[in-house]
UniProtKB/Swiss-Prot annotation:
Residues 1-46, 324-409, 438-478, 573-633 are annotated as: Disordered. May play a role in the organization of the cytoskeleton. This is Leucine-rich repeat and calponin homology domain-containing protein 2. Keywords: Leucine-rich repeat, Repeat. The keyword Repeat applies. PROSITE patterns: CH, LRR. The gene is Lrch2.
Length: 773
């Protein structure tokens, strides 16, 4: 109405318009309207009617009937300055009626005092003001659920906030907070927004917020996130944008996050455990110096990032040598179909100290031969088996003990019975030396510079013997093996004491035999002569009982004692008939034979049958790695014999590896790292060596790039196979050619050195002729 009247005159219209706008302000505006009207009358001259009209205030439109949005869906950027058209009194009055207090954008420095009852307020919006502290009137709002203090000048949060025990939403962003008090986390908060402050850390007490669903600490100066954030089991959204974070805690991988924003930080690696974030829908990671995953993968999006993390997790798991996707003996596994995107960022195998690959564990306990490769193992074992069968058919005198000792013989599958006799240490010494070497290998497995080639047959034995132990933790395994080694040391000492007592008793036995030989013939024919041999038989019983080690099974001991007693009885019957006719030399020899027969596990019938050809000095008995005669004969051998042989073998391998390093560095003019096995595993250096010997012998070489610093296993295998093919074409003989897994698994550096040496020894004329062809 005032606006229409204002249009009546030129100058008077301006006055009426001023009065109309002033009238909207309430009582103060009325004065403005009067003044405006007077101005209009003076200016218009004939328009006094316009100046005298009183402007009627127009009520506020229904747009502000809901001055405060429901719930925690506020977005400070969308707030409009339309609240300025309302009076404080009306806002406070509506807050008393509706429980929603909205004082946003009024530039208030203090909370306006009023006579309104605001104790039932459930939502309070005090954003965009100039409060330097949270108004004390707010602590009286006991049922308060939502508090918005966005864009003020608040520096601290007082302890009185604990009175708001129903507060679930708190927005105190864009203030001057430097710390968050511990008592803040005693509230049942579901949404906490503290962005754009000066926070340098988050208290560990944040783990108390079990119901927290959204946390925004962006645009602060936080350097480390506490591990207690892993206890926020209800957290859906986490915003840590624009801070000084270098590392993301692994505990976040266990949260049900839907949105994660850690952009504009200094994070270099996404933890592998983040692959467990199955509910994650949005991940924002731009403006970070990420190295893992590489940049080109991060640009492809969330799906590729999680693929990379899954592959990385598979590669970091402990791998057994037989579970690798590598070609094995006489059987090449088909290559897995990989897409280009997967192949580009398939990580390299992690041959760490825990993976069981490429480390010299010293697990060479039971093998007595050291074949060169897997082909030699299978061939040698077949020949040994056929020889044993033929020997068992020809030499029937040893068949009686074969079933009882079959279990003991399984660990000596690689021993040829027709080979010449060599010094075989005692059983206790063999096991002790092997376990000591195994323990030393376990303790030094973390030093990758001592990686040496392990003969494949020893790995084959270890897979059968230690498969249950490899599944346990390394610390428990080493502890158990130390206990076993200690028990074997004690057993070995007992065996030596028994052997010493046996030798003493044997000397006494010989002295007794000599005394009996000096007895006259008529006294030997007297009926008392068997009684004279009775103490000797008792002594022999004691000797035989002492010679059996305590580690033998009870059934074996009883069987052998029964057989030895039967042999002794028949022997004394036989000797009593020939005692007068036999000479001193024969008697001494028979005494020794009786002593040896008491030790050999054969029956009496077999003893009679074999007496014709094995009665002599027992030199024609078949060789067996576990025969007691061999152990008794070589009982005095040096217990460190096996250890010395192993150390000599390791020294030879180190020398060959050093020669391999010298050959590569001198030819290629490069400096290889200390871990030469890892340097050669991708096949790049070896392919360059082949091209150095003859250009273009390897047509294509897969090399790492800055974006993908490690080649995939498929590309490594391709390089290695190309190198071996080039060696064949250049003329390297098959017996000097290594296998692919010697390079890929870092287990055959000696074989690789032989191949490289053979490649370097090729005559230049032959290589040139091949290139001409």
């Amino acid at each position: 109405m005032a606006a229409s009247q204002g249009g009546g005159g030129n100058s008077g219209g301006g006055g009426c318009s001023g009065g109309g706008s002033g009238g909207g302000g309430g009582a103060a505006g009325g004065g403005g309207g009067g003044g405006g009207g007077g101005g209009g009358g003076a200016g218009a001259g004939g328009g006094g009617g316009c100046g005298g009209t009183v402007a009627v205030p127009i009520p506020v439109p229904t747009l502000f009937g809901q001055p405060f949005p429901n719930g925690p869906q506020w977005h400070p950027g969308s707030l409009q300055p339309q609240h300025t058209v309302r009076s404080l009194d009306r806002a406070l009055e509506e807050a008393g009626n509706s429980g929603i207090l909205s004082l946003s954008g009024r530039k208030l420095r203090e909370f306006p005092g009023s006579g309104y009852d605001l104790t039932d307020t459930t939502q309070a919006d005090l954003s965009r003001n100039r409060f330097t502290e949270i108004p004390s009137d707010v602590w009286l709002f006991a049922p308060l659920e939502t508090l918005n203090l966005y864009h003020n000048c608040i520096k601290t949060i007082p302890e009185a906030i604990k009175n708001l025990q129903m507060l679930t939403y708190l927005n105190i962003s864009r203030n001057l907070l430097s710390t968050l008090p511990k008592y803040l986390f005693d509230l049942p908060l579901k949404v906490l927004v503290v962005s754009n402050n000066k926070l340098v850390s988050i208290p560990e007490e944040i783990g108390k917020l079990k119901d927290l669903m959204e946390l925004d600490v962006s645009c602060n100066e936080i350097q480390v996130l506490p591990q207690q954030m892993g206890k926020l089991h209800s957290l859906k959204e986490l915003n840590i944008r624009r801070n000084n974070l270098h590392v993301l805690p692994d505990e976040l991988g266990d949260l049900p996050l839907v949105k994660l924003d850690f952009s504009c930080n200094k994070v270099t690696e996404i933890p592998v455990c983040y692959r467990k974030l199955h509910h994650l829908q949005v991940i924002i990671l731009d403006n970070n110096p990420l190295q893992v995953p590489p940049a080109q993968i991060c640009l492809k999006g969330k799906v590729h990032i999680f693929k990379y993390l899954n592959i990385q997790a598979c590669c970091r798991m402990d791998k057994k040598p037989d579970s690798l996707d590598l070609p094995s003996l006489n059987k090449r596994m088909p290559s897995q179909p990989l897409t280009d995107s997967m192949e580009d960022f398939y990580p390299n195998k992690n041959h760490g100290p825990d993976s069981g690959i490429g480390s010299d564990n010293g697990e060479k306990r039971l093998s007595t031969t050291e074949p060169s490769d897997d082909d030699t193992i299978s061939l040698h074992s077949q020949v040994s088996e056929s020889n044993r069968e033929q020997t068992s058919r020809n030499d029937s005198h040893i068949t009686g003990s074969k079933p009882d000792s079959q279990k003991d013989q399984e660990v000596y599958d690689f021993i040829d019975p027709n080979t010449e006799d060599v010094a075989v240490p005692e059983e206790g010494d063999t096991h002790i030396g092997s376990f000591v070497s195994f323990l030393k290998g376990k303790e030094k497995s973390s030093e990758k510079s001592q990686k040496n080639e392990e003969p494949p047959n020893e790995k084959k034995v270890d897979k059968e013997q230690l498969l249950p132990e490899e599944e346990d933790d390394d610390l428990k395994e080493v502890t158990d093996l130390r206990k076993i080694a200690a028990q074997l040391l004690k057993q070995e000492q007992k065996n030596r004491i028994l052997n010493h007592s046996t030798s003493v008793m044997r000397n006494k036995l010989k002295q007794t035999v000599e005394c009996e030989k000096s007895v006259p013939a008529d006294e030997g024919n007297s009926p008392l002569s068997p009684l004279a041999w009775q103490p000797l038989e008792n002594q022999k019983d004691q000797i035989v009982d002492q010679q059996w080690p305590e580690s033998q099974p009870i059934i074996w001991q009883n069987e052998e004692r029964r057989r030895s007693k039967q042999i002794r009885k028949e022997y004394f019957k036989y000797k009593s008939t020939r005692k007068n006719s036999s000479g001193n030399e024969n008697e001494e020899q028979e005494s020794d034979n009786a002593h040896m027969s008491a030790q050999s596990p054969v029956s009496s019938e077999e003893y009679d049958r074999s007496d014709g050809f094995s009665h002599g000095p027992f030199g024609l008995k078949p060789r067996s790695a576990f025969s007691r005669a061999s152990r008794q004969e070589y009982g005095a051998a040096d217990p460190g014999f096996t250890m010395r042989r192993k150390m000599e073998h390791l020294r030879e391998e180190r020398e060959q590896i050093r020669q391999l390093r010298n050959n590569l560095e001198s030819r290629l003019k490069v400096i290889l790292p200390d871990d030469i096995g890892a340097a050669l595993m991708d096949g790049v250096v070896l392919c360059h060596l082949a091209n150095h010997i003859r250009p273009r012998s390897v047509a294509s070489i897969h090399v790492p790039s800055p974006a993908v610093p490690k080649l995939s296993m498929a590309k490594c295998r391709r390089n290695v196979e190309n190198f071996l093919d080039a060696c064949k074409k250049l003329g390297v003989s098959q017996e000097r050619l290594c296998l692919p897994h010697h390079i890929l698994e870092e287990r055959g550096l000696v074989k690789v050195g032989v191949t490289v040496q053979a490649l370097l020894e090729l005559p230049t004329t032959k290589a040139s002729q091949l290139s001409m062809a």
